[in-house]
């Protein structure tokens, strides 16, 4: 067992982390995390619902009726992703020994530079700083000067900005950032009685920039869509950081002797999600946005997912109230079991052996959980979590979104399931986080702690091991009722 100095304990306490949590993390480094036991990859008819075209309007009507009630609907947008990875090829060009574009990527970038949404503002910067337009600089062979003004702080600083604040989309006479596209989307499907609630999770160093951007553009979109925006921001809590260790599993220390903590990954956001108060929450990543001309599908299928969620939640609440009242017979219990198995895809081997109070307790426990409906698209080789039927610690089988790291690569059946999976999850979720009495669930209670992930990293040339928390839409929502609905690829545009 590791002995922490008073200074260590002070550092741990300042982060809001308990010593017992640190000790548990150190144990997890030693033991590792178990792979999940799988039953099958989900497919249409086996865990994935394919809604007939004629039924889509029924669910959209349900959603529109729901919005007319006294409800709070919120768009929750993980937006801390840095843009630096998007520009790795341009950073490589800046440090290359040659000055003119040579690779296919570099040639394509410069020959199409006018098509980028940031072109006009970059051109303006080049004229102000160099007295030359982008094209004049290129004609002089100053390609790196153009890239320098794009990526670094002397110009637009895109290499240091988050993706949400880059000009992504070009329209006639204007351009939009992903942050703005989410404002537009919110008005189109998450507008409840003229109010649109959005919550962006951002990194601390960029919070002011996001706030400035919203304050700058909000009025324009409020006028355009005749809505009022309520926009809030949060950052990952320091208490969700995880301790880093050396290869021998002893705590890694910085050069000043202090412990090294690292962000716990997107799974840390379950705490942020737990802090927002809403009846229905749409979750979609910041960079998954489409131009207006393609938004019709996005809006239609977001409303479809929400309608499916409202339909299933209404039925689950009805059954929970019945179970609570005691006014049911055996046929009703069989009906509830069918709903749990056929609609929520939650199976318990040997359920027929449960009787009376034991069966009622089981049904209550499984129905009285947060619920999410996830859009899944046909697999075209994009990276993303896969929809699976997986075993839970209580022996039940339910739907989960799994990443490749959660699957045992030495199990040929499992790797075949993963590689031959028909669908993937593009992080397109609609969530219900309140119970049938209208009280909020405490979301950390529904996390499967055994689904974390250990990765190898380095700092200052020294190897270390890092611990990632169960992913937000993976293990952090493991104990939710999960439903998959097929949506078209046109709704996914990272």
What feature does the model see in each segment?
Residues 2-44, 362-367, 372-373, 380, ...:
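Long, compositionally biased intrinsically disordered regions
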Residues 10-13, 31-34, 38-380, 384-385, ...:
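Domain-scale recognition of functional cores that engage charged ligands
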Residues 88-89, 244, 293-295, 413, ...:
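Short conserved micro-motifs at the rims of enzyme active sites and ligand-binding pockets
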Residues 132-140, 287, 302-341, 418-494:
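Conserved catalytic alpha/beta cores of large enzymes that bind or transform nucleotide phosphates
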Residues 183-187, 411-414, 469:
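Short amphipathic beta-strand starts and helix->beta connectors
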Residues 206, 381, 408, 435-437, ...:
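Residues that cap or initiate secondary-structure elements
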Residues 281, 391-426, 435, 451-455:
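C-terminal, active-site-flanking charged/polar segments
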């Amino acid at each position: 067992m590791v002995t922490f100095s008073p200074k260590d304990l002070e550092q741990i306490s300042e982060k809001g982390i308990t010593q017992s949590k640190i000790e548990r993390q150190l144990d997890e480094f030693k033991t590792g995390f178990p792979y999940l036991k799988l039953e099958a990859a989900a497919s249409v008819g086996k865990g994935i619902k394919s809604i007939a075209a004629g039924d889509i309007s029924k669910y959209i009507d349900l959603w529109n009726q729901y919005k007319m009630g006294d409800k709070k609907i919120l768009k929750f947008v993980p937006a801390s992703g840095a843009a630096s990875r998007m520009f790795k090829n341009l950073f490589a060009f800046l440090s290359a020994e040659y000055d003119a574009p040579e690779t296919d990527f570099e040639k394509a970038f410069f020959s199409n530079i006018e098509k980028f949404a940031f072109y006009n503002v970059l051109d303006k910067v080049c004229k102000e700083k160099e007295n030359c337009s982008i094209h004049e600089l290129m004609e002089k062979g100053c390609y790196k000067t153009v890239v320098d003004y794009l990526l670094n702080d002397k110009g637009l600083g895109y290499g240091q900005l988050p993706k949400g604040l880059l000009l992504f989309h070009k329209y006639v006479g204007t351009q939009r950032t992903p942050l703005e596209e989410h404002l537009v989307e919110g008005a189109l499907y998450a507008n409840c009685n003229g109010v649109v609630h959005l919550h962006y999770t951002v990194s601390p160093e960029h919070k002011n920039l996001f706030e400035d951007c919203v304050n700058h553009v909000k009025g324009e979109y409020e006028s355009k869509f005749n809505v009022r925006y309520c926009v809030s921001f949060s950052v990952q809590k320091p208490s969700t950081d995880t301790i880093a260790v050396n290869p021998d599993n002893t705590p890694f220390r910085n050069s000043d002797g202090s412990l090294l903590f690292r962000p716990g990954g997107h799974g840390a956001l379950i705490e942020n999600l737990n802090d927002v108060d809403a009846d229905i929450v749409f979750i979609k990543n910041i960079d998954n946005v489409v131009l207006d001309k393609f938004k019709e599908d996005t809006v239609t299928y977001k409303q479809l997912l929400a309608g499916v969620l409202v339909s299933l939640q209404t039925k689950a609440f009805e059954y929970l109230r019945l179970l609570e009242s005691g006014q049911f017979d055996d046929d009703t219990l069989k009906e509830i079991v069918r709903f749990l198995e056929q609609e929520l895809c939650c199976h318990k081997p040997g359920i027929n052996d449960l009787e009376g109070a034991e069966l009622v307790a089981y049904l209550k426990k499984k129905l009285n959980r947060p619920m999410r409906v996830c859009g899944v698209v046909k697999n075209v080789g994009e990276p993303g979590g896969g929809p699976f039927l997986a075993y839970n610690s209580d022996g039940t089988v339910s739907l989960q979104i799994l990443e490749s790291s959660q699957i045992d690569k030495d199990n040929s059946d499992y790797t075949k399931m993963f590689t031959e999976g028909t669908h993937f999850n593009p992080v397109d979720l609609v969530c219900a986080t309140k119970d049938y009495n209208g009280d909020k669930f405490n979301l950390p209670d529904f996390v499967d702690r055994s689904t974390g992930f250990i990765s190898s990293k380095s700092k200052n040339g020294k190897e270390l091991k890092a611990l990632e928390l169960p992913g937000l839409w993976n293990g952090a929502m493991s104990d939710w009722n999960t439903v998959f609905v097929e949506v078209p690829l046109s709704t996914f545009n990272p």
